[in-house]
């Protein structure tokens, strides 16, 4: 009704105002209502057992992705009418929310590598992550890339040298990882010792050591004992030169090595010595030489190769380059502004030391860094006010980047700690594997020796002795099979060899002791797999039947249970674990135990005379179950 009214109402209104005449024909059919979403358009996504439901139109908003394209049909299961994905359901929640809201977020508690794998699987690019999470995502990804690179470098300079490595690669590996060999470790400690000696000598040679004969003024130790310090400096420089040349020759890329920071430090540390050897005694040149000797202090940076803390500090400063640049730029702006203000504020004072704006730079730097030497102080009230503001602003400007630097240092430090821990765990794991292999080999050889000794003792007729030896893995599995069959079928199983011996000796059916096929039933042997009952004696059915009589032998798939009347119950089971018919009466008053013959395939044994061992006789009886060991 409402639909019909809605159809002709526009025509009636138009005719009333004279826009168009009333239609003479029949009214048009009412417009069809938009088909509502039915259950057919509801898609069920099963992600590792977790069910997600969403509309098909929601997924088809992004046809370039896996869920939005027809490729998702490859994961459809008609039986369950679900799309099954063997992926992480926790990360999939965020991916499905992207289809719903159009905003992709990064879960901070998830692994960055697993998150990237899920995005790649479902066809999403990381660039669509929202602005609220993108910066943290990039930081985590950069940290993970650095960690993987460190692990790769560690693996390349691992503990074990590859047999295909050249001499050049071995030398470079020894420099980068001194713990790979004894010679590399010795050279590592020798260079560290000479670095310390060089730095100490550079400091001690400036200490006054008294006046020499003919001089009133005290001379420094470097001038009074010039020969000793020169020899010491020569020895240190020779060691540093040899190290630098070896590193240059063994470097994978000499161009990159020469441009590296540590290479420049090495050159600056040894260059003043060689310049001093070729310089003349001219006073002007001597003054320049004194200036060059200042660069010897850079030898202390060579300790960075020997100190993990210094390397972490260098990595921190490198990773905080943007923050340090912002700090330097902010300080420069503040220094220029406050130096200009202080100069004009103190310009009217006659005793003011702020003679120019560059002269006020010193006061501004000292004040903003909260040092306050007191050599330059403002005299006017305006100067004191602006000086206080300068001091407070310096605290704020310097304190802002400090937490970022500290967090980066902590992050890099913990990364190195985890890397060291992983290397230690890997080393311990390899040591355990080597020990296990060595122990297994020793145990195997010992078992072989025990087996040979046992065979020799058993073959000796003069000194018969019983020597217990542990069975092979095949025998262990065989006895375990017997134990499981006994527990499953309530039948007693006997080896075929034992059964043959018992049938051949009819008079000794009730033997005082028998060789049980189980490891645990052997005297002096303790089973580690399963414990079977040790039978002092067992009853063998149809023991009085001659061995030449050929009887019927049952297969394991058919097990007959007999009672006192010996009435066979025709019941077969294709599996030992299958349930039997309820009509089968298992608990008889006097059960008759079915005996099984366990056949272990053994190679034919040749007697000393050269004849082969005769075949095993066939045995009759309907109560015999033959079980093949294979």
UniProtKB/Swiss-Prot annotation:
Summed up, the tissue specificity of this protein is: Detected in brain cortex, hippocampus, dentate gyrus, thalamus and cerebellum. Detected in neurons from the primary visual cortex. Detected in the supraoptic nucleus in hypothalamus, in hippocampus and the habenular nucleus of the thalamus. Detected in the bed nucleus of the stria terminalis. Detected in dendritic fields in the hippocampus CA1 layer, in stratum radiatum, stratum oriens, stratum lacunosum-moleculare and stratum pyramidale. Detected in dendritic fields in the hippocampus CA3 layer and in dentate gyrus.
Chain ranges on the Cytoplasmic side, renumbered to this chain = 1-184, 250-256, 308-321, 404-630
Q: How does it sit in the membrane?
A: Multi-pass membrane protein
Gene Ontology MF terms: A-type (transient outward) potassium channel activity; metal ion binding; monoatomic ion channel activity; potassium channel activity; protein-containing complex binding; voltage-gated monoatomic ion channel activity involved in regulation of postsynaptic membrane potential; voltage-gated potassium channel activity
Question: What is one GO biological process annotated to this record?
Answer: membrane repolarization
Q: Which residues carry this modification: Phosphoserine?
A: 438, 548, 552, 572, 575, 616
Task: Share the record's PTM remark.
Answer: Phosphorylation at Ser-438 in response to MAPK activation is increased in stimulated dendrites. Interaction with KCNIP2 and DPP6 propomtes phosphorylation by PKA at Ser-552. Phosphorylation at Ser-552 has no effect on interaction with KCNIP3, but is required for the regulation of channel activity by KCNIP3. Phosphorylation at Ser-552 leads to KCND2 internalization. Phosphorylated by MAPK in response to signaling via the metabotropic glutamate receptor GRM5. Phosphorylation at Ser-616 is required for the down-regulation of neuronal A-type currents in response to signaling via GRM5.
Q: Name one Pfam family in it.
A: BTB_2
Instruction: List the residue ranges of the region (Important for normal channel activation and inactivation, for interaction with KCNIP2, and probably other family members as well).
Output: 474-630
Task: Give the intrachain disulfide bonds.
Answer: none
Task: Give the residue interval(s) assigned to the motif PDZ-binding.
Answer: 627-630
Signal sequence span is: none
Query: Region labeled Interaction with KCNIP1 — which residues?
Result: 71-90
Q: Give the catalysed reaction(s), semicolon-separated.
A: K(+)(in) = K(+)(out)
Also noted in the record is: The transient neuronal A-type potassium current called I(SA) is triggered at membrane potentials that are below the threshold for action potentials. It inactivates rapidly and recovers rapidly from inactivation. It regulates the firing of action potentials and plays a role in synaptic integration and plasticity. Potassium channels containing KCND2 account for about 80% of the neuronal A-type potassium current. In contrast, the potassium channel responsible for the cardiac I(to) current differs between species; it is mediated by KCND2 in rodents. Is specifically and reversibly inhibited by the scorpion toxin Ts8 (AC P69940).
Similarity comment text for this entry:
Belongs to the potassium channel family. D (Shal) (TC 1.A.1.2) subfamily. Kv4.2/KCND2 sub-subfamily.
The family database entries (PANTHER family) matched by this protein are listed as: POTASSIUM VOLTAGE-GATED CHANNEL SUBFAMILY D MEMBER 2 (PTHR11537:SF265), VOLTAGE-GATED POTASSIUM CHANNEL (PTHR11537)
What is the protein's given name? A-type voltage-gated potassium channel KCND2
User: What's the source species for this entry?
Assistant: Rattus norvegicus (Rat)
């Amino acid at each position: 009704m409402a639909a019909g009214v809605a159809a002709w109402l526009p025509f009636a209104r138009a005719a009333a105002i004279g826009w168009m005449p009333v239609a003479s024909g029949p009214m048009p059919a009412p417009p069809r209502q938009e088909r509502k979403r039915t259950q057919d358009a509801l898609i069920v996504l099963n992600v590792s057992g977790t069910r997600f439901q969403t509309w098909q139109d929601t997924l088809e908003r992004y046809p370039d992705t896996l869920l939005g394209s027809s490729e998702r049909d490859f994961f459809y299961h008609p039986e369950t009418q679900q799309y099954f994905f063997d992926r992480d359901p926790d990360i999939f929640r965020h991916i499905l929310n992207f289809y719903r809201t159009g905003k992709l977020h990064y879960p901070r508690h998830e692994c960055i590598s697993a998150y990237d794998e899920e995005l790649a699987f479902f066809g999403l690019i990381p660039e669509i992550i929202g602005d609220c999470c993108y910066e943290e995502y990039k930081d985590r990804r950069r940290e993970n890339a650095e960690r993987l690179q460190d692990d790769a470098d560690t693996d390349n300079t691992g503990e074990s040298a590859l047999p295909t490595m050249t001499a050049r690669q071995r030398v470079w590996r020894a420099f980068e990882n001194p713990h790979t060999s004894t010679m590399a470790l010795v050279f590592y400690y020798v260079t560290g010792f000479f670095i310390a000696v060089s730095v100490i000598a550079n400091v001690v040679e400036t200490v006054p050591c008294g006046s020499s004969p003919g001089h009133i003024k005290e001379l420094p130790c470097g001038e009074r004992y010039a020969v000793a310090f020169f020899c010491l400096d020569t020895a240190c420089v020779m060691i540093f030169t040899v190290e630098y040349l070896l590193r240059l020759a063994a470097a994978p890329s000499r161009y990159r090595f020469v441009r590296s920071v540590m290479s420049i430090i090495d050159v600056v540390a040894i260059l003043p010595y060689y310049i001093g050897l070729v310089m003349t005694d001219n006073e002007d040149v001597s003054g320049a030489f004194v200036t060059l000797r200042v660069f010897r202090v850079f030898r202390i940076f060579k300790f960075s190769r020997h100190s993990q803390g210094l390397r972490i500090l260098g990595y921190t400063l490198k990773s905080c380059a943007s923050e340090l640049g912002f700090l330097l730029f902010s300080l420069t702006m503040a220094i220029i502004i406050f130096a200009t203000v202080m100069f004009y504020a103190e310009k009217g004072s006659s005793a003011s030391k702020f003679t120019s704006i560059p002269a006020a730079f010193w006061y501004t730097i000292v004040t903003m860094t909260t040092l306050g030497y007191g050599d330059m102080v403002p005299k006017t009230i305006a100067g004191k006010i602006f000086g206080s503001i300068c001091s407070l602003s310096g605290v704020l400007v310097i304190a802002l980047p400090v937490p970022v630097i500290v967090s980066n240092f902590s992050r890099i430090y913990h990364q190195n700690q985890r890397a060291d821990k992983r290397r230690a765990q890997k080393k311990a794991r390899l040591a355990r594997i080597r020990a296990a292999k060595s122990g297994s080999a020793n145990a195997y050889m010992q078992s072989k020796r025990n087996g040979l000794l046992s065979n020799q003792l058993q073959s000796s007729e003069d000194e018969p002795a019983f020597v217990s030896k542990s069975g092979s893995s095949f025998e262990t599995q065989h006895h375990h099979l017997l134990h499981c069959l006994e527990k499953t079928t309530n039948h007693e199983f006997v080896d075929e060899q034992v059964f043959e011996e018992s049938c051949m000796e009819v008079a000794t059916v009730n033997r005082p002791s028998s060789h049980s096929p189980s490891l645990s039933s052997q005297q002096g042997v303790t089973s580690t797999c399963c414990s079977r009952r040790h039978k002092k004696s067992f009853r063998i059915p149809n023991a009085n039947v001659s061995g030449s009589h050929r009887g019927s032998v049952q297969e394991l798939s058919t097990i007959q249970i007999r009672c006192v009347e010996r009435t066979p119950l025709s019941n077969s089971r294709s599996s030992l674990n299958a349930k039997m018919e309820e009509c089968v009466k298992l608990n008889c008053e006097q059960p008759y135990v079915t005996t099984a013959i366990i056949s272990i395939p053994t190679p034919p044994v040749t007697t000393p005379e050269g004849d082969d061992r005769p075949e095993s006789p066939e045995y009759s009886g309907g109560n015999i179950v033959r079980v093949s060991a294979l």
